[in-house]
Amino acid sequence: MKHEWNLCPSIFFSIFHICLSVQTNYGPYFFDNGPGSTNGNMALLSLSEDTPVGAYIYALNGSDPDGDPVTFGLTFEPGSKRYFAVDPDNGNVTLIEELDREKQDEIEVIVSISDGINKVSEKVRVLVTDANDESPGFLNTPYIVTVPEDTPPGSSIFKIEAVDKDTGSGGSITYIIQEMHGSKFTIDRHSGVLRIKAGVSLDFEKSRTHFVSVLAKDGGGKLRGKNQVFTSTTTVTINVEDVQDSPPVFVGTPYYGYVYEDTTMGSEVLTVKAYDGDRGNPNTIYYSIVNGSDGAFTINNATGGITVIKTPDELKKEVYELKIQVSEITPEGDKVAHAFTVATVRVVDLNNHPPTFYGENGPQNRFELTMYEHPPEGEILRGLKITVNDSDQGANAKFNLRLVGPGGIFRVVPQTVLNEAQVTIIVENSAGIDYEKFHLFTFKLLAIEVNTPEKFSSTADITIHLLDINDNVPRFSSEYYIARIPENSPGGSNVVAATATDLDSGLWGEIKYSIYGPGSDPFLIHPSTGIIYTQPWASLDAEVTSKYNFYVKAEDTEGKYSLAEVFVTVLDINDHSPEFSENIQEKTLIIGTPVKIEATDHDAEEPNNIVDYSIMQADPSNVFDIDQSTGEIKLKSYIRSLDIIQNITRNKDCKWSVVVQAKDRGSPSFSTTAVVKIDVTEETLLHKGPMAAFLMQSKDNPMKALGVLAGVMAIMVVITIFISTAMFWRNKKSNRVMPLRRIIKRRKNDHPPRTARTEWLKFKKSNNSADKFTIQEMESGPKNENRNNNYQGIPVPPRAPCPPPPPRLMPKVSKTERSLPTVSGSLTPKIIDQQMNERVPSASAALVSELKQMLEKKNAGSSMSFY
């Protein structure tokens, strides 16, 4: 019972606590951790705009007093872009949309926390901080500026504006001119004001437009964790406006003037000269002396002439430096531009005369002369009467002479003068004085003092006019001319124009043409134009003469000439028909061997003279063929005997008349026909003997047979005469023709008998015909002479005379090749047996045998000489 009582208070308190809890359930709340916190309710959260999408940016954090679990939520105002998302369980917030501070610098978001019963919501603002993600941008482009050229240096001419949407250093802009070297402009780095550089001016006459490239650069800043600088560029076009801004310009500076002791007051000492720098619309020039004159000089305001207004004795200084001002006067009379120079005036009492040139009539600074071209080198131009004089004395009167102009043509003598001299101009280069190159020469003769500080000088203009002479030979345009003309060209046809030129003028440049040479007969030439044409009677024929060669002469009026060679080729045309040879009327054709006909075309060139052959008519037509190119006529290949011919034709005697055509290849083509009588025979008919073969071969040409026969007879007569002459000899004393005597010299009787051994014999050839052959002993001894008809010794018993020596041996011929001539001139070899009788031994062998017999008889008898 006690135990039950103890449980009652516990149950009571539990029920009370539950009831109390139901009645007092508290809502959850966010932790407020302050600025910079990464968890809490996102109050005062700042987020850089370069935060990448998907990045974790915050953690919502809170608690429930009752200890219940909480969840988190995140919403946006209706119509707003959702930038964040939250995990309801852990409160992690993620960026889901790219931030851009320049478009939205703060984001309103509603965060909530709930314990399942109670939900607490808070509206917070998330600040978007800047990142340097924008480039500078120029405003109001393009930039075109017009600036007067007289704008002072350093002046502001334009302001360039650029903006950068970034904040802080990323939004600050610095301006820079690119390519500063050589630029006439500068820019304020912070304001963007464009100015003309100090010390630099614009000039419309030099440059009308300038292009300036300007760079705008921000101050840099962080972007995604890295320092980033952005730039932009633009071009400023500056047009320079022309104004009257160019000052006058002096010419001929420096200026020097002299006042001599004899100078009179009011004399002009020197003249200064200036012109307006603005050439387009120049203003009037006004001269004035600013200072330095000390009242001794004045200047002509319009001409610039400076005049001395005191006498030389009143001048207190030796040198006056006159500061001369020149001004431009506007049409309104205002002085708008100025320029300054210094004119030096020296007061001297010596050397007050410059060199002066004189002609025949006094002082003169221009001389002229007319002369022929190409004078000899070293010749003096006597037509120029020039004297030079310096009235000063001593060293002040010494000066040099010099020719100024084309160099190396003339030279002046003397080159150094004291007081006065006669000026001589001499030819130095005759070839350079050429009328065809220059009609006149212009020189300046300069005289300049040597040892004076003033270096006074004077000039004289020398003009030399040239006259032409005939110094040029006519020249042909070519050394040779090649022409071609058809052979049928009528008389008077143009062949070629041989033109020449003569550089001389007038009559000396006129040319007359002529031709000469062995080949010029058919041609004429126009004496003025050089056109070569054929004689009216000329009939050119390439078959007679196809090439002509002659000379053309170009001659001027004084006989100077040049030559050119002319080559004329006469072009062949087809004007001849082929002509058959005379021996084609009758032909003998051996079976297996062709006969040839031949025609000649007298045209000079191919293809006009190429002949083609053809058979126009033959009955029957199946017997003969002809070679188109050679003209050889032969039987058809299947005809090999007379029997075949007689079987296929009606003509049993094998004789035909064939009409043959010869046609050339010219255009137009010409042709000729001829009738050839052909007698067909076989080769076996020629074996009946040499004479029969020869007569058969010569059947077509009987004159050939007669000629051969006459030749053989003439050869036999010549041989007979030669042999007869050799056997007889003329005795000079008796003037009779007698047989040749042979003299034999013997040894004395005391010698042993001689034998007929031929080694002791020696033939000796003599120039004397009476001693044609002699045999003498080798040993010396008393001569045994034969005195011919005057010898009175014992005569030898008579004996028969020696027969004449036989003819020379002919070679033994067993077989000789005989040839059968054909129409074409070719030879057909034929083998003919011919037996030749052997000849007797030669004459020399017979003579030796006879001499040996005589020697043997004399050895037995006496020591006399035998005839």
From Swiss-Prot:
GO biological process, one term: homophilic cell adhesion via plasma membrane adhesion molecules
Gene Ontology CC annotations of this record: cell-cell junction; plasma membrane
Residue ranges annotated as Cytoplasmic topological domain: 729-867
Subcellular compartments: Membrane
Keyword Membrane: yes
Renumbered residue ranges of the record's region Disordered: 777-825
Molecular function terms, GO-annotated: calcium ion binding
Domain Cadherin: 39-138, 139-250, 251-357, 363-476, 477-580, 572-692
Biased composition regions of type Pro residues, renumbered to the chain: 795-809
Domain of life: Eukaryota
Signal peptide segment: 1-21
Keyword Iron: no
Protein keywords: Calcium, Cell adhesion, Membrane, Receptor, Repeat, Signal, Transmembrane, Transmembrane helix
Stored Gene3D superfamilies: Cadherins
Main localization, broad class: membrane
Membrane topology: Single-pass membrane protein
InterPro entries documented for this protein: Cadherin-domain_protein, Cadherin-like_dom, Cadherin-like_sf, Cadherin_CS
Free-text tissue specificity from the UniProt record: Expressed in photoreceptor cells of the outer nuclear layer of the retina and in the pinal gland.
Extracellular face residues: 22-707
Pfam families, per database record: Cadherin
Stretches that traverse the bilayer: 708-728
Function according to Swiss-Prot or TrEMBL: Potential calcium-dependent cell-adhesion protein.
Protein's UniProt name: Cadherin-related family member 1
Source organism of the structure: Xenopus laevis (African clawed frog)
Record gene name: cdhr1
